[in-house]
Amino acid sequence: MAVASWAQAGALTQKDASKQGEAVRKWFLSALAMNMMKAQALTAWQVSEEQRDWLRLLADRVQIYATPRRQRMDLYNNHDYWSSWAVMAAGLVLDEPARLSWAEQGYWLAIGQITPRNGGVVLPREAARGKRAEEYHAFAITPLILMAEAGTRNGLPLYEGDGQQLHALAAQVVHFWAQDGKGVSFAQRQVAIDDHKMAWWPVYAHRFPERLPLPAGDADRFGSRFTGGSLAGLWQATP
């Protein structure tokens, strides 16, 4: 099994990583932890102690890099959302509540960035991305929905209170994906959003089918490499 050899080698745990290396590390941790969650939920597989140590070190590295960025809200963007989710996912696999608390703090910082604009809502850092603004909104909301869902299943009511703003953002992103012209529009012609950037949608639609039902077809088409593939079957039971 590849994960065993990666753990033995301590893959991606080096201290001195470039900015791009740090980005890759958090995305890798997200996909890795989510695949571990799927394996634990759907098979008899269990994480070994060596793999736990490796996962713990990866999460530590992500937190060390991401924590200072929370003091710079002018920089805080989708990268930070993904860092928070990656650490939360690792915390769920490791059963380490402190990591969930750290991730929750990052979640609320992100929720605070949701801003009304022209009949819809935007994330200002992502709205500044020119022709890819809509695409980046789809990418950015994915870790937020995953944190809200995982948090809800673990005693953190992240869809409630200010978290209700996530519903407006989800609706706006679906409008972007559908190219229906509703809500916010940008001056520059936008790149179409590929289905794999909508990996969050099956999770959200399962909990809130009356809000944003999935279009007819195979929900697996919304799988993403950043989430370890499709999430359509991971959280089917609503607590």
Indicate residue ranges for each PLM-predicted region.
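Aromatic-lined, polymer-binding surfaces characteristic
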Residues: 1-155
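Surface-exposed patches in mature extracellular/periplasmic domains of secreted proteins
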Residues: 155-162
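Terminal, non-catalytic domain-edge segments
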Residues: 146, 150, 154, 168-172, ...
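Acidic/histidine-enriched alpha-helical segments
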Residues: 163-167
